[in-house]
Design a protein with these regions (language model features):
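Bacterial N-terminal signal peptides that target proteins for export
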Residues: 1-11
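N-terminal signal peptide c-region/cleavage motif recognized by signal peptidases
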Residues: 19-20, 25
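Periplasmic/extracellular electron-transfer cofactor-ligation site
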Residues: 25-67, 73-78, 89-98, 120-122
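Alpha-helix N-capping/helix-start residues
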Residues: 27, 81, 107-108
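Short, exposed beta-strand-loop hairpins at the edges of beta-sheets
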Residues: 103-107, 113-120
Length: 122
């Protein structure tokens, strides 16, 4: 009886963790999605948005060669997984009054994939 219960518990736990790898973020898919972002976020000095190379772990409004909005300057964020996720999903909710003219990306998996891609930018 105890062996049977332990076996069932092991199978249940194994099933729970079987899909974990399948849910991992996909940087290559994130790169495909980033094409829309690249319309503004480029390495050109006259770009509409700031350069996102090295954005992961960087403080918000940290690039000296980009003119950030006052709300972004006051945001005092560090671009980690949580802050990037919130901002990509709904920029105005995360930093009210920022200038990014983007409504947000609603699919959570797509957001995670974009973040995985941003982590590759150095």
């Amino acid at each position: 009886m105890k062996v049977s219960m332990m076996l069932r518990a092991g199978v249940a736990l194994g099933g729970m963790f079987a899909g974990v790898g399948a849910m991992a973020a996909d940087a290559s898919h994130g790169k495909e999605l980033f094409v829309a972002c690249a319309a503004c976020h480029t390495e050109r000095p006259d770009a509409i948005g700031p350069n996102l190379n090295g954005v992961f772990g960087r403080k918000s409004a940290a690039l000296e060669d980009f003119r950030y909005s006052n709300p972004m300057k006051r945001a005092n964020l560090v671009w980690d997984d949580d802050n990037l996720r919130d901002y990509i999903k709904d920029p105005q909710a995360k930093v009210k009054g920022n200038r990014m003219p983007y409504a947000g990306l609603t699919d959570g998996k797509d957001v995670d994939d974009v973040i995985a891609y941003l982590k590759t930018l150095k």
